[in-house]
Design a protein with these regions (language model features):
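A short, Lys/Arg-rich alpha-helix, primarily the initiator
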Residues: 1-20
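Residues within the helices of the helix-turn-helix
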Residues: 8, 19, 33, 47, ...
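Short, charged recognition helix plus adjacent turn
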Residues: 9, 62-81
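Alpha-helical residues within the helix-turn-helix
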Residues: 12, 23, 51
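Short alpha-helical DNA-recognition segment
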Residues: 15-33
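Short, basic-rich loop-to-helix N-cap that marks the start of a DNA-contacting helix
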Residues: 39-51
Length: 81
């Protein structure tokens, strides 16, 4: 599962806000809402944020293994181990 905790820290460290992302950089409020809810965003949006914040992807997101009993991606069964 991807978590966005570092996104908020990086945004604050760079002196940006959701207001500036929406109004200065034309990031949609829907994208901000998806991040806030922990939902997926495109790699193109991650690239946009890396350019805005002058950072690397790992400064925005972290992969966390799902706990036992938590639903996995429907694609996980198709990935060879």
């Amino acid at each position: 599962m991807i978590v966005y905790d570092k996104f908020w820290e990086t945004m604050k460290r760079c002196g940006e806000s959701t207001y500036t992302l929406i109004n200065r950089y034309n990031i949609s409020s829907g994208t901000i809402d998806r991040i806030r809810k922990g939902q997926g965003i495109t790699t193109a949006k991650l690239d946009d944020f890396c350019q805005i914040f002058h950072c690397r992807v790992e400064d925005l997101i972290t992969y966390v293994e799902p706990a036992d009993g938590e639903p996995h991606s429907p694609y996980s069964e198709k990935i060879p181990k």
